[in-house]
Amino acid sequence: MSAQTWTGRILQQIKGVNPFGGDCVPSRVSLFGPGRPAMPVPLPWNYKEPIQIFEAFYSEADRETGWGKHNRYLYAAGLPPVLVTRDPGIIKAIQADTGDKPGQFDRDTSPTAGIARATGEDSLLYANGSIWRRQKSMVAKPFSRSNLFQPQKFHGFEETFRKTAMKRLEALRAAQKSSGEGSTRVELDLEIKVVMLEMLVNNFFGGTASYDELRDRFIPAVVYMIDHMVRDTVAPRAQSIARKLSGGEKILQQHRADFEKLTDIALSGRSEGLGLWNEFHSEAPDEALRSNIRVFLAGAMEATTSFASWAISHLSHNPEWQARVYDEVKDMDVYDPDDFTKAPNLNRVLEETLRLTPALYFFPRRATVDTWVETSDQRKMMIPKGTHIRLDVWHSNRCEEFWGEDVTGYPADVFAPGRWDIIEERGLSAKDMLHFGFGHGPRFCPGRSLGLLEVGLVVGALIKIFKFKAVNDETGASAGVSTKPADGVLVDLELRNAE
């Protein structure tokens, strides 16, 4: 940034000039203010509460008239503006205009700097421009719904899950028998992580890793590396010093080595065309693929675990919907793609989970030039070059104006799968009611179909075997790379065949 640019911004900021244009300009947020849950910027002492950081942008927003209460910006210290929006029209327009063409929005890489340092900068997640376009074309076929939802491949995922589920079921039966209790209190978060990583490594990539090795070695490594990526993004120098003083550098190196070993296992099936490697067509050497494999292993495990954990957590608070899904899956001995996709109650539960508690709670973008965006209802906004954009889908999906009783028949901030029936009855289409659970536009998440397949299998099979009830009356959210239930999905499990 040149001195001239910095000086110009400082003058604008002092004068209170709004750098945005159009008929739905955002309103300004001050850096400091009373009564807010957090400062509106990530700092070493608040970065573990990103949802509260976003909430700070909407402090006193109800005093604004028009679209300024949903589109907010921070402009301080001579730095570029930061636009945070929960306006679904603006979110959709910006995502649709993100890509590699001149004048389109880039993915803002600043929130993922730590991820890039740990996994590589040439990944589909981090790259922009022609590198991103090339990476996207390579993964399109393996991740496609038409490919994953073929019966043979679908059954492969199911068989892996069935073996793991039976192993854990026998362990649970033994524990209940020895204790004499009809239910067992467990945190399901770790078990969900193992199942998701197992299907990803052994089915998708055609590798071979045992349940025990995944649980005891690779899950701890991946979880540690994900936490390290977040810390390394917010305060890299401070974290480096802290590791050296505490001896944490040795721990990091061990987990990094285990993460690399897991990457080796995922790549091992490529030469024989195992798993989905036979759908992957590229002459690139294995070494050139490592960045993407690391991102897929960490990102897909994290996102699908979040998705499944939230679905199970919501159902643990909703016995009525748990019973509805059970009625759909109880007679399914083998899950076929047609049976799975035609289970309306299960699919409503998954859709509502993505709406209320999306794993990816915001999407970062950056304006490469002064850019005009137009919404489907013809509103316009000019976003100045260099603006950091945060598409806040978490708060968008919980906003009463967009998802509340007047629109969907239910309050926006409650889990209500029945709202999707009302949406359909009122003639609203999927395009009208986007929840952005997997993003939108050219940079939507390529793992959408894989996530739906894995999570549908896990949730359906769990309900078929167990009744489960939440231990806590309410379950809060924690957030880092993704969101997840803060209690680790703490439930009381009861075997259905014990009735």
Task: List the predicted regions and their residue ranges.
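N-terminal membrane-proximal hinge/A-helix region immediately C-terminal to the signal-anchor transmembrane segment
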Residues: S2-E121, S130-R134, R162-K163, K385, ...
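Conserved cytochrome P450 K-helix E-x-x-R motif and the immediately C-terminal K′/meander segment
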Residues: L43-T65, S268, Y335-R379
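Cytochrome P450 heme-thiolate monooxygenase catalytic core
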Residues: R107-A113, P151-A308
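Short, small-residue alpha-helix embedded
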Residues: A303-S316, V458
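Cytochrome P450 heme-binding "Cys pocket" and the immediately downstream C-terminal segment
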Residues: P319-W321, H440-F444, R448-A486
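Hydrophobic, well-ordered secondary-structure elements that form the walls
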Residues: T353, G386, G441, V455, ...
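Conserved cytochrome P450 K-helix/beta-meander segment immediately N-terminal to the heme-binding cysteine loop
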Residues: L391-R426
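C-terminal helix/juxtamembrane-tail motif
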Residues: K484-E499
